[in-house]
């Protein structure tokens, strides 16, 4: 047993220039874990609370000194002397101490940073890479897979300052046989997309997640540009590369009139009409995954969408499920969607994150591990994806170090497992619900 001997919280800066919480957990023997909480832009209303100070004189009110204070005081006092490898116990102590349904006393940003730092310190104390330790916590020791990247190469919605309503247009390099090859394909398409956009006189500045953020006439235009880029890179769309979208529909859903208002296109849709709009895009392009294709509270709309599209493509719940097992359980019972997006700051601890992944898999749903639009150099989600054999990862485009850090960690893990004589499989499109 390696006891926790020191806990340190600090305010650091994320990829959007906003503060976030970093935690250090020290164990006996000199083992240290360091982790930082990410932050979202388009957030589900039922997510665990990210505690901000609200002091307009610092960081426009976005400081996290209250959350940092919770780490350095109440949380530290509660877990000092505890066994660092008792992950579930440590997480439960923090959850109970917070005492709220949504972690609003200390902030999910405080609790998560300590939770992840504890896991990293415990992994170090056991001489294990983080992905291997996560697999042990998951009850699946030695079971790994390399995730299929869903690479966000055109950004819209809340992630970009442009007129594109759909938040993410992604490529899936399904023709690859390894993770590293998938990243090469993604990079080549990304660079060719820059050329395509420039040739059309369009902006090649990037959004929060490293994808391009041009003004386009329609969402279909974004898909057409990506198709051209895939072909210019020498690949076949639908065979080597498939497509995915994150609609983030809650961001353009008008609760007053019940319409999905796509201002960039000047179009409005009822819930069912929007499902058929997406169906039309799927018929025109090889779109294999759609995330949040309805408003988070439009469960009737999601049920209809699942009936229409759920047998053909992956329907991922992000704002819909917010990595919460209570909400996911209800969704499974009602046949809503067929996949869950996993963002550990939506729920606020590693233990609860692993529970959501397990519940999804047990129900035949897929689990897509995801970054947030506000990130740091912390690459824990790469280890989470491999250690749970989740099969898919969303961590942005082929630019911005906060995104590429995760891809580079995946390269290291793939290389290490191969060198140990236990290569992790890369299953490509087979990992996507409905595509096996």
Curated annotation (Swiss-Prot):
Which terms are listed as keywords in the entry? Cytoplasm, Glycolysis, Lyase, Magnesium, Metal-binding, Secreted
Where it sits in the cell: the answer is: Cytoplasm; Secreted; Cell surface
Please give the CDD domains that the UniProt record associates with this protein.
Answer: enolase (cd03313)
Can you name one GO molecular function term for this protein?
A: phosphopyruvate hydratase activity
EC number(s) recorded for this UniProt protein:
4.2.1.11
Its GO CC terms are: cell surface; extracellular region; phosphopyruvate hydratase complex
Cofactor(s) required, per the database record: Mg(2+)
Task: Tell me if Lipid biosynthesis is a UniProt keyword of this record.
Answer: no
Return the broad EC class.
lyase
What Pfam families does the database record attribute to this sequence?
A: Enolase_C (PF00113), Enolase_N (PF03952)
Q: How is the cofactor bound?
A: Binds a second Mg(2+) ion via substrate during catalysis.
- Listed binding positions for Mg(2+) are 246, 291, 318
Where along the chain is (2R)-2-phosphoglycerate bound?
A: 167, 343, 372-373, 394
Q: Which residues form the active site?
A: 209 (proton donor), 343 (proton acceptor)
Specify the pathway. Answer: Carbohydrate degradation; glycolysis; pyruvate from D-glyceraldehyde 3-phosphate: step 4/5
Q: Please give the catalytic activity noted in the UniProt record.
A: (2R)-2-phosphoglycerate = phosphoenolpyruvate + H2O
The biological process GO terms on file are: glycolytic process
Q: Give the InterPro entries listed for this entry.
A: Enolase, Enolase-like_C_sf, Enolase-like_N, Enolase_C, Enolase_CS, Enolase_N
Q: Keyword rRNA-binding on this protein? A: no
Its annotated function is as follows: Catalyzes the reversible conversion of 2-phosphoglycerate (2-PG) into phosphoenolpyruvate (PEP). It is essential for the degradation of carbohydrates via glycolysis.
Quote the subunit structure annotation. Answer: Component of the RNA degradosome, a multiprotein complex involved in RNA processing and mRNA degradation.
Concerning its family, UniProt says: Belongs to the enolase family.
NCBIfam families in the cross-refs: eno (TIGR01060)
Q: State what protein this is by name.
A: Enolase
